[in-house]
């Protein structure tokens, strides 16, 4: 009987102990409710004890987590209703702010602070923009707009809860509109391809033009060099001819000077040589060597006047 009682008490103790012992995983903290009231105790990861049946344990994540809002409606300013398949909000809760946020918003704080706020901000954004802006022009800014709006409100409503990033999928639009947009994108792509092709053609034409300019400049430079060479040859030839002419002129002048000098000297020599006595001597010699006989009245004058009249 005592043995059975002891075994029963031991089993009861084991059951109570197993209910009292709980584990908090890494990256989480434990919060406790007793009688529906939140206790101020916040426990770290590990094993802990609590009073079974009176105290309830809740685990709250304090590392990065991703909250996902699905099928979020978006009514544009033009009256077209579209849906975002999925909007992901990456956030984390500071351990020091766990008690205050859980007390104000329960352990499901992400429902009022993130999910509901995402729907509200999406509607606010879509209501002031057209379908074109939401679907194409401003789509890359939606995530940043939602992130900034969420963080601005969290600073006021739940300090310690931070939004790291927001990811937004492409919205679903009515099929007819989607097909029109696809056609429009296809035409835009064709236009871009045509523009790029035109740029390539223009680039090639510009390259050919530059090549032609370079070739023309090269030909002009070659022609200029050739012309300069010809001019240089002409100038050299002219200079050589001029030098040759000057040399010939100098030679002729030298010859003329020599002839003039010779004639001048001969004249001076003759002037010195042809004296009156010498001329008389030569005349006598000429008469003496002349075997012709002269007759007439003018014979004496031949010797006196030096005339050459004769009669045979």
From Swiss-Prot:
Coiled coil: none
Transmembrane feature ranges: 4-24
InterPro entries in UniProt: Band_7 (IPR001107), Band_7/SPFH_dom_sf (IPR036013), Erlin1/2 (IPR033294)
Glycosylated sites: 104
Tissues expressing this chain: Expressed in the germline only.
Keyword set includes Cell wall biogenesis/degradation: no
Biological processes, Gene Ontology terms: SREBP signaling pathway
Keyword Membrane: yes
Alphabetic keyword roster: Endoplasmic reticulum, Glycoprotein, Membrane, Signal-anchor, Transmembrane, Transmembrane helix
Location of this chain's protein in the cell: Endoplasmic reticulum membrane
Membrane topology, as annotated: Single-pass type II membrane protein
SMART domains named among the record's database cross-references: PHB (SM00244)
Phenotype upon loss of function: No visible phenotype, with no change in growth rate at 20 or 26 degrees Celsius, general morphology or lifespan compared to wild-type. Does not affect brood size, embryonic development or defecation rates of itr-1 (sa73) mutants. No change in development or survival compared to wild-type animals following exposure to ER stress inducing agents such as tunicamycin and dithiothreitol.
Pfam families: Band_7
CC per GO annotation: endoplasmic reticulum membrane; protein-containing complex
Segments on the Cytoplasmic face: 1-3
Lumenal side, ranges: 25-312
One GO MF term attached to the UniProt entry: ubiquitin protein ligase binding
CDD domains: SPFH_like_u3
Annotated PANTHER family: ERLIN, ERLIN (ER LIPID RAFT ASSOCIATED PROTEIN) HOMOLOG
Record-stated family: Belongs to the band 7/mec-2 family.
Subunit annotation: Seems to form a multimeric complex.
Record-given protein name: Erlin
């Amino acid at each position: 009987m005592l043995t059975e009682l002891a075994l029963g008490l031991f089993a009861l103790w084991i059951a109570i102990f197993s209910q009292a012992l709980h584990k908090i995983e890494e990256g989480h903290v434990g919060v406790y409710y007793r009688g529906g009231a939140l206790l101020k105790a916040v426990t770290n990861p590990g094993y802990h004890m609590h009073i079974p049946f009176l105290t309830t344990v809740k685990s709250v994540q304090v590392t990065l987590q991703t909250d996902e809002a699905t099928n979020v409606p978006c009514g544009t300013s033009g009256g077209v209703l579209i849906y975002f398949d999925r909007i992901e909000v990456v956030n984390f809760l500071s351990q020091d702010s766990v008690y205050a946020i859980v007390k104000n918003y329960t352990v499901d704080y992400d429902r009022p602070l993130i999910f509901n706020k995402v729907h509200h901000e999406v509607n606010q954004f879509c209501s002031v923009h057209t379908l074109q802006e939401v679907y194409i022009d401003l789509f890359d800014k939606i995530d940043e707009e939602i992130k900034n709006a969420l963080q601005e409100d969290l600073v006021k409503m739940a300090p310690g809860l931070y939004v790291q990033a927001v990811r937004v999928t492409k919205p679903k639009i009515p099929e007819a509109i989607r097909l029109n947009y696809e056609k429009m994108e296809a035409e835009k792509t064709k236009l871009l391809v045509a523009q790029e092709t035109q740029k390539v053609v223009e680039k090639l034409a510009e390259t050919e033009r530059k090549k032609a300019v370079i070739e023309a400049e090269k030909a002009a430079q070659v022609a200029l060099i050739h012309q300069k060479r010809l001019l240089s040859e002409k100038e050299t030839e002219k200079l050589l001819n001029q030098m040759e002419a000057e040399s010939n002129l100098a030679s002729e002048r030298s010859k003329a000077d020599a002839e003039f000098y010779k004639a001048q000297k001969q004249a001076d020599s003759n002037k010195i040589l042809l004296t009156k006595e010498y001329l008389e001597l030569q005349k006598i010699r000429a008469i003496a060597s002349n075997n012709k006989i002269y007759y007439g009245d003018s014979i004496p004058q031949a010797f006196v006047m030096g005339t050459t009249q004769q009669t045979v």
